[in-house]
């Protein structure tokens, strides 16, 4: 019987429907790339596929098999009787035990393909139990999709027992053997398989490229695997062959491509997350089974890539095949979708993540960036954009990011940097830390190792990460965080102050330069502003009459919370109940402290304070009532530039030295002047609002000898 493997004519309506679905804005698409249809284009001449019936072949679903996954021409390809060796000593360690999201199922590739409806016989000559044969690598059940491009269920599986086992799949498919997760058998187990075809798999380290390309051209087996030590990619033969015909380098570089994938998986995922190949400690053991990517013609939820329990499933397109099979695409950091999917498998569960909001999006791109940087150094490939959704490249944005960090240390990252480029800027900072003193990412590996022992981590702030960083290098990294505008809590700063300041200006490290460290200079510790811990301070806001003076939700304790998105605003109303100036903020530091000056962050609203007078009592005896008229206050310093309208970002900290070091416990901040907006209309709705005062942070600092 002859079958014509040509989908375009038979399924034009379905293809049109799917094309529309891909471009509808309401669709739930995982990534935004230029993805073509997942079905085979078949622009070449039609192929006559001859099927010799009889011999027990089930032909009942040939028409469906012709559509997907394809038919084997029985006059071209012959079935084989072969012995298959499997290492059943490989261990399956559940994802939960490794503190990751997903690990590969214990599935073995066989290099064999079952023809549609053809009987496969598997013989087990010993008492081995716990094995299952799967025919068809496309395990997704697409029942909920309508219309569909293939039958919803195209796989068949059967448990294997000692002796002779038979199985057939009316649609055919690649043959996998899955081991029960708790089985630990012989390293040299052998089974016999009869009636299958050899698939033209490429196996790194054993396949000859020239012979392989010839096999691709002559066989009619429709699917194959590209296999390394840590990866196995199920791809369509015709699509791969078309790609090789267009670019023979794809085939020539296939050994290098799969070796690069193996290195990427082992280095950027396994080792990075503190997993080691073959580790005897199973909680630290990298998966023994390969990371699988299966290309399919259609995915659930109209996605074109998703994480399944057996691997990554991606749409069968030239774009995604190129991510898998092209050496240059991989080494230049353009295999974005596949790397992101692998990250979702190996990242920690959210409860154990150390990454705070300012950098969390950048962390996902670390493996891809490391691959691209390696490709730049080793092969000279220009780096991919890393964050294609930003619409700009790393090469364009990194210099801007470094210029931002190098300007000064009065920064506020989430306010200064546009949201669309924050991941690139944050990634630049993480790369700099990875190369501090030539550490080469070792700190991150140690961080991930430590996390495994934690039940949960508070990543609402950067404190956990910051403390771990300081402990690892035995240095205080506050200057680095300040240059990048990352918020630090007083607790974190106090903790780090036991270490000497970092001695290298690593924020000058330029990752893409020929000599990245050439601009890194020594960082002088003299003159650094060490901030006092304000955790025990008490603060009161009072008006000229001694009454509480703050607006709802904007109490004065917000000035001490290390969060510039909050702050104090004095009470106001639309009538005369807005209290008259001057206003006062009274601070009890709870102990007499050496103070060299104050820092504060302004407010860019119309209520921003314009003048602050910092005072302290002449007598530092215990004060029970800050309104006591017998207390004599003396001025230390006057600040009148906090709300200057031309300052680029008045929410960044500014530091003000005292004329000389003071020993103080109590401070009073006097605000005698109207706010910076002198354009309030004398109407009922705005009258007296010129009195309102507001700023976001206040604290004191000291110098170390």
What label would you give each PLM region?
Residues 222-435:
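Catalytic cores of extracellular degradative/oxidative enzymes
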Residues 460-555, 578-581, 596:
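Beta/coil-rich, acidic/histidine-enriched accessory regions frequently appended to metallopeptidases
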Residues 563-630, 650-705:
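Aromatic, loop-rich ligand-recognition surfaces of beta-strand-rich domains
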Residues 233, 395-493:
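Active-site-proximal alpha-helical
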Residues 181-229, 677-705:
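Exposed low-complexity, polar/acidic, P/S/T/G-rich flexible segments that act as propeptides
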Residues 40-200:
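Beta-strand-enriched, solvent-exposed domains that form extended recognition/catalytic surfaces
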Residues 1-9, 17-65:
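Bacterial Sec-dependent N-terminal signal peptides
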Residues 152-176, 637-677:
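Beta-sandwich interaction modules
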């Amino acid at each position: 019987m002859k079958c014509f493997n040509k989908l375009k004519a038979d399924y034009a309506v379905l293809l049109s429907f799917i094309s529309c679905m891909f471009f509808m804005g309401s669709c739930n698409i995982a990534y935004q790339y230029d993805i073509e249809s997942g079905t085979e284009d078949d622009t070449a001449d039609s192929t006559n596929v001859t099927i010799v019936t009889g011999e027990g072949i089930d032909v009942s679903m040939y028409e469906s098999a012709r559509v997907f996954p394809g038919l084997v021409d029985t006059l071209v390809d012959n079935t084989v009787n072969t012995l298959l060796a499997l290492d059943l000593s490989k261990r399956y360690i559940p994802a939960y035990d490794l503190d990751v999201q997903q690990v590969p199922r214990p599935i073995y590739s066989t290099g064999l393909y079952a023809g549609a409806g053809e009987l496969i016989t598997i013989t087990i000559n010993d008492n081995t139990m716990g094995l299952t044969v799967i025919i068809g690598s496309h395990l997704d059940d697409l029942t909920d999709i309508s219309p569909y491009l293939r039958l919803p269920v195209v796989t068949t599986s059967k448990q294997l027992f000692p002796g002779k086992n038979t199985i057939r799949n009316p649609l055919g498919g690649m043959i996998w053997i899955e081991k029960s997760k708790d089985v630990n058998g012989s390293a040299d187990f052998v089974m016999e398989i009869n009636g299958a075809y050899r698939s033209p798999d490429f196996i790194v380290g054993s396949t000859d490229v020239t012979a392989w390309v010839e096999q691709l051209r002559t066989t009619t087996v429709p699917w194959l695997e590209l296999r390394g030590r840590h990866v196995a990619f199920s791809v369509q033969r015709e699509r791969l062959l078309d790609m090789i015909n267009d670019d023979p380098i794809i085939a020539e570089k296939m050994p290098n491509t799969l070796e690069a994938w193996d290195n990427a998986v082992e280095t950027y995922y396994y080792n990075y997350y503190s997993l080691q190949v073959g580790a005897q400690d199973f909680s630290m053991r990298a998966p023994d089974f390969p990371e699988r990517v299966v290309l399919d013609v259609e995915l659930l939820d109209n996605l074109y890539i998703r994480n399944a329990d057996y691997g990554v499933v991606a749409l069968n397109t030239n774009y995604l095949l190129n991510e898998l099979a092209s050496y240059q695409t991989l080494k230049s950091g353009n295999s974005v979708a596949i790397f992101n999917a692998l990250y979702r498998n190996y990242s920690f569960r959210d409860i154990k993540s150390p990454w705070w909001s300012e950098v969390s999006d950048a962390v996902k791109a670390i493996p891809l960036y490391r691959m691209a940087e390696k490709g730049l150094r080793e092969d000279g490939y220009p780096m991919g954009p890393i964050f294609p959704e930003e619409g700009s490249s790393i090469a364009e944005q990194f210099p801007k990011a470094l210029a931002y960090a190098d300007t000064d240390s009065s920064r506020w990252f989430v306010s200064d940097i546009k949201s669309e480029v924050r991941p690139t800027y944050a990634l630049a900072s993480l790369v700099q830390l990875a190369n501090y003193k030539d550490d080469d990412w070792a700190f991150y590996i140690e961080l991930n190792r430590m996390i495994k022992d934690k039940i949960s981590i508070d990543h609402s702030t950067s404190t956990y990460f910051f403390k771990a960083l300081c402990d690892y290098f035995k240095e205080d990294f506050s200057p680095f965080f300040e240059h990048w505008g990352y918020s630090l809590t007083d607790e974190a700063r106090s903790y780090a102050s036991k270490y000497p300041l970092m001695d290298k200006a690593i924020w000058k490290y330029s990752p893409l330069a020929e000599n990245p460290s050439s601009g890194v200079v020594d960082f002088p510790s003299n003159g650094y502003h060490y901030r006092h811990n304000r955790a025990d301070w008490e603060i009161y806001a009072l008006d000229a009459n001694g009454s509480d003076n703050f607006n709802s939700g904007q109490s004065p304790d917000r000035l001490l919370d290390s969060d510039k998105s909050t702050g104090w605003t004095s009470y106001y109303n639309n009538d005369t109940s807005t209290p008259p100036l001057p206003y006062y903020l009274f601070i009890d530091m709870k102990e007499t402290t050496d103070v060299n000056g104050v820092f504060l962050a302004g407010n860019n609203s119309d209520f921003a304070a314009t003048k602050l007078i910092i005072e302290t009592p002449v007598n530092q005896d215990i004060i029970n009532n800050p309104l006591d008229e017998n207390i004599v206050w003396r001025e230390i310093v006057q600040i009148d530039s906090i709300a200057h309208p031309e300052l680029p970002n008045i929410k960044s900290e500014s530091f003000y030295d005292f004329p000389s070091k003071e020993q103080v416990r109590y401070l009073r901040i006097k605000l005698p002047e109207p706010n910076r907006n002198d354009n309030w209309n004398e109407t009922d709705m705005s009258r007296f609002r010129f009195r309102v005062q507001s700023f976001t942070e206040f604290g004191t600092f000291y110098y170390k000898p």
